[in-house]
UniProtKB/Swiss-Prot annotation:
Top-level taxonomic group: Eukaryota
Pfam families: Exo70_C, Exo70_N
Tissue-specificity statement: Mostly expressed in leaves and, to a lower extent, in roots, cotyledons, internodes, flower buds, siliques and anthers.
GO biological process: cell wall modification; defense response; exocytosis; positive regulation of defense response to bacterium; positive regulation of defense response to oomycetes; regulation of defense response to fungus; regulation of stomatal closure; response to bacterium
Record text on subunit structure and interactions: Self interacts. Interacts with EXO70B1. Interacts with the exocyst subunits EXO70H1, SEC5A and SEC15B. Binds to SNAP33. Subunit of the exocyst complex that mediates vesicle tethering during exocytosis. Binds to PUB22.
Transport keyword on record: yes
Gene Ontology molecular function, alphabetical: phosphatidylinositol-4,5-bisphosphate binding
Lineage summary: Eukaryota, Viridiplantae, Streptophyta, Embryophyta, Tracheophyta
Protein species of origin: Arabidopsis thaliana
Protein's UniProt name: Exocyst complex component EXO70B2
GO cellular component: cytoplasm; cytosol; exocyst; extracellular exosome; nucleus; phagocytic vesicle; plasma membrane
Length: 599
């Protein structure tokens, strides 16, 4: 009868508390007052005694019987205990008492007389823990409903939900924290977590928590428009598609590591506060982040292990730099022993991206070596391989600091002032020039060989001036290359015009002068006809060449004509010999040398 009275008394307490507006604190006060009375309502002994260490087996038995009755009444209910604040408070009080008794029993483990009670307590704790595990999930599942309709994520007017999961919208301010759960919900979760850890169910509690939070992160990641490609899919996808995916990946990973993961860490710290050890917090945070982190890292790893085609350099460098920027954040967020494998994997992938970039430079070298001379390039203009390599290197040098770090494999232990990127690029340019030397041999006209080299070297020099590429190459390289360009210019002028101008010597007899004039016209016409079809794309170089040619031909021709007219042999003759061109005619024809393009 006394036991039935106890049940009626506690049932009455719950009814009174509900009538007072479901105030958990009021419920606790009422339960505390009424728990001191027996079934008759008189103040009496505690119906659920907590024996001292030396207490009798009978006291333990009575206490466990009372707890079994009260706890079982909650466990058998289909309705969630945490749907009612009074019930949750009462249930936690019973759990606390059960854990206290179990602790006393464990301290008396050597006493065979309490073995049966200890077994009963352990069995009841198992039942309680399983129910708390369910309740923990219930509280997390109902968390979105606890938000007011006006609650919003920063930077958005609407707060989307999908299947009860709060979904983060795109934001631009990384110095924010997502308050995914209200303080009251966090308090409930913490209360359950403290009991589950005390009951030996820390991993189970962590598992329930992390599964719910992973769902939030996965849904949020999908809203960032990442395709979630497997490593095989990355390897098979067209590079143009992957370029777009890399851009989305960089934005997503920045947001994840600067906003979402720090917010999840703070939430873990609050939910699992007041625990005797931090391992539950660290384990839970790792489990929450592991799936998302692995997905992000797998994509970067697939890119790192993919093709080394030269056109991939720039996006791979973007990935490398994004990882580089995130490493300090990872070092902070993933500092504990549970997260250290994620941190180490990120560092390894960052290293593999660097290896991929070095491999891409090697493939660029091979591309230059494999580019065959084939047939002569029309007009001796700038070869496509020259344009490709120079624009490539110029674009690459925009990431100069990263490339310096990547290419410095030895850490410059020799103390040399030579920078690894400078060495690499100069080597690529040497390969390019060697390739161009092979291509110039396809021209039968030596003058066109020199013009071809002049065109390409002028393009190389112009691309290296006044930009990051020039800073990498250094002033000495530019000065030496300018001298080489002048030498090509001199060689062209000598091979093209020395023989033509040589016909304008004035030290021969009159008949010889007349013959030389005829030969000059023939050769001059032929050279100008041919070279008017040659290509000099650079306007400045084109004018310099024309001026240079005019500078040696015009004075020689003018002097020759004057000498011819003044020759004594023409005295007494009728008129002067036939002179095909005036000096102005020669200069006009020279101005028609070369064209801007081969089209």
């Amino acid at each position: 009868m006394a036991e039935a009275g106890d049940e009626n008394l506690y049932a009455a307490a719950r009814d009174i508390a509900r009538a007072l507006g479901k105030d958990p604190s009021a419920a606790g006060d009422i339960l505390q007052i009424l728990s001191g009375y027996g079934a008759s309502g008189n103040r009496g002994g505690d119906p659920r005694p907590t024996p001292s260490r030396g207490g009798s087996n009978v006291n333990f038995d009575r206490a466990l019987t009372s707890l079994e009755r009260q706890i079982s009444s909650y466990i058998v209910e289909d309705r969630p205990i945490w749907s009612d604040p009074v019930d949750s408070r009462t249930f936690l009080d019973s759990v606390d008492e059960l854990l206290a008794i179990a602790g006393d029993l464990r301290s008396m483990a050597g006493d065979k007389s309490v073995a049966v009670c200890q077994s009963r307590a352990d069995e009841l704790i198992q039942q309680v823990m399983f129910r708390l595990q369910e309740e923990f999930g219930f509280v997390m599942d109902r968390a979105p409903d606890s938000f007011d309709s006006d609650d919003e994520f920063p930077g958005e007017e609407d707060n989307d939900t999908s299947d009860g999961v709060i979904v983060a919208r795109p934001i631009t301010d990384y110095k924010i924290v997502i308050e995914a759960l209200q303080s009251s919900v966090i308090g409930d979760l913490n209360a359950i977590a403290v009991r589950m850890v005390a009951g030996g169910f820390a991993k189970e509690c962590s598992r329930v928590y992390s599964s719910r939070r992973r769902e939030f992160l996965e849904e949020s990641l999908s809203r960032l428009h990442l395709r979630g490609l497997s490593m095989e899919e990355v390897q098979e996808s067209p590079w143009q598609d992957l370029e777009d995916e890399i851009d989305r990946w960089i934005k997503a990973v920045t947001l994840i590591f600067h906003v979402f993961f720090p917010s999840e860490r703070l939430l873990c710290d609050r939910v699992f506060s007041d625990l005797p050890v931090s391992s539950v917090t660290d384990l839970s945070f790792m489990e929450v982040c592991r799936g998302t982190t692995t997905q992000l890292l797998n994509f970067a790893d697939a890119i790192a292990l993919g093709s080394r085609l030269p056109e991939r350099l720039f996006k791979v460098v973007d990935l490398y730099e994004a990882m580089q920027d995130l490493i300090p954040k990872m070092e902070t967020l993933f500092s504990d022993r549970y997260c250290s494998p994620l941190r180490h994997e990120a560092l390894a992938i960052h290293k593999r991206l660097g290896e991929a970039i070095r491999g891409i430079f090697m493939e660029l070298e091979n591309l230059i070596r494999r580019d065959p001379p084939k047939t002569a390039f029309p007009g001796g203009g700038i070869h496509p391989i020259t344009r490709y390599v120079m624009n490539y290197l110029r674009a690459a040098c925009k990431s100069r600091q990263s490339l310096e770090q990547i290419l410095d494999q030895t850490g410059n232990e020799t103390g040399s002032d030579t920078r690894p990127l400078s060495v690499q690029i100069i080597w690529v340019l040497e390969l390019l020039e060697s390739n161009l030397e092979g291509k110039k041999r396809t021209y039968r006209d030596p003058s066109l060989c020199f013009l071809f080299m002049m065109n390409n070297d002028k393009y190389i020099l112009d691309k290296a001036k006044d930009n990051e590429l020039g800073l990498v190459l250094g002033e000495d390289w530019i000065v030496k290359h300018a001298a080489k360009l002048r030498q090509y210019h001199s060689n062209y002028r000598r091979s093209s015009w020395n023989q033509v101008v040589g016909l304008l010597r004035t030290d021969g007899p009159y008949p010889k002068l007349v013959e030389n004039l005829r030969l000059f016209k023939s050769q001059f016409d032929e050279v100008c006809k041919v070279q008017s079809q040659w290509v000099v794309s650079d306007g400045q170089l084109r004018e310099e060449l024309r001026s240079s040619v005019a500078g040696i031909v015009s004075p020689a021709y003018s002097n020759f004509i004057r000498r011819l007219k003044e020759s004594p042999e023409i005295n007494g003759r009728r008129g002067e010999p036939f002179i095909p061109y005036t000096v102005e005619d020669v200069e006009f024809i020279i101005k028609r040398l070369f064209k801007e393009s081969s089209s």
